[in-house]
């Protein structure tokens, strides 16, 4: 692990609770797509955030931070970012990184800002294996929480092997996509997941249910399912 000092180069409020933050580390850095960093608050307090940027983007690190009065843990990090414009990070962490040696079709599943984890893997896969079949499911409470959906739709125009399925729990009048939970959508769309590499990010309970149901009902292999949650559940 390496500790780096990072200058905060930009902060964008992309929804009422999600911030896109770009960091400029003071030294070269290495990580694998799907890994995360720790923001060092003090010697005993380090807080994890997935990197939304890719390993090939050497000039910056991008984070998507969901922070609000209901999430004071992340809000304290945002307060420091906004106040000090400099943070220390510990990098890299996590074992749920993208397995590039596999040729299996990819299933990427994200809930909320778990998208940052799948974004890094998605962009890396398209860059290094541009013909690999990829299905990307992104779930949010409302359509506004699928904040980078326009970027994903542009990617589907460039890569016919990429399928993006957005899912919202509460649809509004202008919503034309799927409604419900992201796991329900996956189960409806796949009769078998036997040969898929599955990467999942979101609430721990979602990851737990996904592993149980995908393995028991859709023949998925637990050894081919990746997510930081699986280190803890």
UniProtKB/Swiss-Prot annotation:
Keyword vocabulary terms for this entry: FAD, Flavoprotein, Luminescence, Oxidoreductase
UniProt entry tagged with the keyword Transmembrane helix: no
GO molecular function: oxidoreductase activity
Entries under PROSITE patterns matching the protein: FAD_FR
Gene Ontology process terms (BP): bioluminescence
Enzyme Commission designation: 1.5.1.-
Pfam families reported for this sequence: NAD_binding_1
Gene3D superfamilies recorded: Nucleotide-binding domain of ferredoxin-NADP reductase (FNR) module, Translation factors
Keyword Oxidoreductase set for record: yes
Function of the molecule: Involved in bioluminescence. It is a good supplier of reduced flavin mononucleotide (FMNH2) to the bioluminescence reaction. Preferably uses riboflavin as an electron acceptor when NADPH is used as an electron donor.
The family this protein is said to belong to: Belongs to the Fre/LuxG FAD/NAD(P) flavoprotein oxidoreductase family.
Protein name from the UniProt record: NAD(P)H-flavin reductase
């Amino acid at each position: 692990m390496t500790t780096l000092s990072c200058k905060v180069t930009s902060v964008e409020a992309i929804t009422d609770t999600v911030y896109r933050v770009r960091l400029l580390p003071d030294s070269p850095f290495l990580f694998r797509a799907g890994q995360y960093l720790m923001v060092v608050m003090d010697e005993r307090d380090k807080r994890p955030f997935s990197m939304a940027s890719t390993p090939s983007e050497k000039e910056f690190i991008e984070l998507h931070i969901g922070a609000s009065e209901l999430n004071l843990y992340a809000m304290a990090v945002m307060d420091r970012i906004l106040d000090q414009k400099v943070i220390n990070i510990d990098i890299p962490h996590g074992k749920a990184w993208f397995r590039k040696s596999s040729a299996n079709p990819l299933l990427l599943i994200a809930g909320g800002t778990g998208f940052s984890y799948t974004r890094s893997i998605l962009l890396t896969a398209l860059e290094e294996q541009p013909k690999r079949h990829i299905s990307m499911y992104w779930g949010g409470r409302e359509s506004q929480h699928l904040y980078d959906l326009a970027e994903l739709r542009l990617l589907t125009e460039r890569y016919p092997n990429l399928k993006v399925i957005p899912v919202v729990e509460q649809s509004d009048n202008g919503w034309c996509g799927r409604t419900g939970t992201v796991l329900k959508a996956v189960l409806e769309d796949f009769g078998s997941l036997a040969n898929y590499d599955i990467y999942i990010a979101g609430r721990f309970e979602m990851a737990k249910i996904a592993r149980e149901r995908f393995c028991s009902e859709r023949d998925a292999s637990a050894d081919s399912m990746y997510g930081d949650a699986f280190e803890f559940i």
